Design a protein with these regions (language model features):
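Residue-level detector of anion-binding/catalytic polar loops
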Residues: 83, 114
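RNase H-like two-metal-ion nuclease catalytic core shared by retroviral integrases
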Residues: 89-91, 95-108, 115-138, 153-158, ...
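Short small-residue beta-strand/loop micro-motif enriched in glycine and branched aliphatics
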Residues: 55-59, 116-118, 142
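Residues immediately flanking
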Residues: 27, 51, 63, 91
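C-terminal domain-tail junction helix/linker
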Residues: 5-12, 21, 111-113, 135-190
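Mobile-element integrase/transposase regions
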Residues: 1-49, 55, 71
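Active-site beta-loop-alpha junctions of metal-dependent nucleic acid enzymes
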Residues: 41-42, 58-82
Length: 190
């Protein structure tokens, strides 16, 4: 029946049990800033979101290569206070390739991070990363007038800080990612 079909295609929602159990990653090509010519090289937004807490990490990098993905991973590992066990992405070439020579895959292996991938041509299975990119586009990029690429990077840092410490998230009982992490690591404080 029609109802059975809809229920089968409905998303299976889940939340991981602890911080770092799985981080969802994705990449998006950013639009040009007002005043830039169409020949200007595009920049790319890299995001990582912790499944348990919804803590967001983001960076703007010059290209969508395995080396930029590796650089972003190293930035996340430097900033992240908990161990990341799995990194879940689509099958983009920035994340997947020959494991013996691919910079991002080598960095994951060195950090003992298991890579997990979406089924081919099903980006919706990486919904948390897809959704956070949509949020970034709608609440940060479309609402801010950037006067330079450096200004855009600065505003991204501010937005990520707001997202992690002020914005409540329905998927984690209207807590902020910071509150979710504090509840996990310091339950006696609440």
């Amino acid at each position: 029946t029609e109802l059975e079909k809809r229920l089968k295609t409905q998303a299976r929602r889940y939340n991981k049990e602890y911080p770092g159990e799985m981080v969802h990653g994705d990449t998006k090509r950013l639009p040009l800033i007002t005043g830039e010519t169409t020949t200007a090289k595009r920049e790319y937004l890299f995001v990582a979101i912790d499944d348990y807490s919804r803590e967001l990490y983001a960076a703007i990098l010059p290209d969508k290569t395995q080396h930029s993905a590796q650089r972003f991973l190293k930035q996340v590992l430097t900033e992240c206070p908990y161990t990341i066990e799995q990194w879940y992405t689509d099958n983009g070439t920035e994340y997947k390739g020959d494991s013996a020579h691919h910079a991002f895959m080598i960095a994951c292996a060195a950090a003992k991070i298991e890579q997990r991938f979406t089924k081919v041509k099903t980006p919706q299975t990486n919904g948390k990363a897809e959704r956070v990119i949509r949020t970034l586009v709608e609440m940060w990029h479309e609402k801010t007038q950037f006067n330079s690429r450096a200004h855009r990077k600065q505003e991204l840092i501010r937005f990520v800080n707001w997202y992690n410490t002020v914005k409540p998230h329905k998927g984690i009982n209207n807590r902020t990612p910071m509150e979710q992490l504090i509840t996990y690591f310091y339950p006696e404080q609440l």
